[in-house]
Regions:
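Short alpha-helical elements
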Residues: 1-172
Length: 172
């Protein structure tokens, strides 16, 4: 479905530029899989997504919140490798810094990693191209079921995110 929308926009079906990010989400009491994200002080899950420059999803992965952004992204790359064959560059935020992540990304996808850093600390500024992935997370948040993790299993949480994106894409 993503490929068809990209063709309608006059683009190739597979993206060459991927923007990645992770979002921590709180669990409800029914969830079995729990982890604690020490950076955001959230007990729950993390959604790792990779989108193109239009905000269309090419990679979705769900882990417990204690998994680092780098480790979750590498897991997602390995799982979604067939969808990411044409990717040449990956844009990420400061949570993905480090040579081991860049080397593992190159080994898995054959893509270079570019880190989008803020120019000044403690000042809000929209980082060009990074807002696209944040907008995609905002689209997911419009789905009421995804505002908290209500699912018992991680795979169920993943499928709910996929269904939410399918509902969004079917409206395009």
């Amino acid at each position: 479905m993503v490929g068809a929308i990209r063709q309608g926009l006059g683009r190739d079906t597979a993206t060459t530029f991927l923007i990645i990010d992770a979002q921590s989400e709180k669990n409800t009491d029914t969830a079995e899989n729990k982890g604690f994200d020490g950076g955001k002080l959230i007990s729950g899950i993390k959604r790792h997504i990779g989108v193109d420059t239009n905000g269309l999803p090419h990679m979705i992965h769900v882990t417990t919140a204690n998994v680092t952004d780098r480790a979750g992204a590498l897991e997602a790359f390995a799982l979604c490798k067939d969808n990411l064959t044409n990717v040449q560059k990956v844009l990420a935020d400061g949570g993905y810094t480090g040579e081991p992540f860049a080397a593992a990304t190159y080994e898995t996808l054959g893509a270079a990693v570019e880190i989008a850093k803020r120019s000044e600390l403690h000042k809000f500024a929209v980082i060009p191209k990074r807002w696209v992935v944040e907008r995609s997370f905002a689209w997911l948040e419009k789905c009421r079921r995804l505002w908290k993790n209500c699912e018992r299993k991680l795979n169920s949480s993943l499928q709910m995110a996929v269904l939410a994106f399918l509902a969004l894409l079917s409206k395009r």
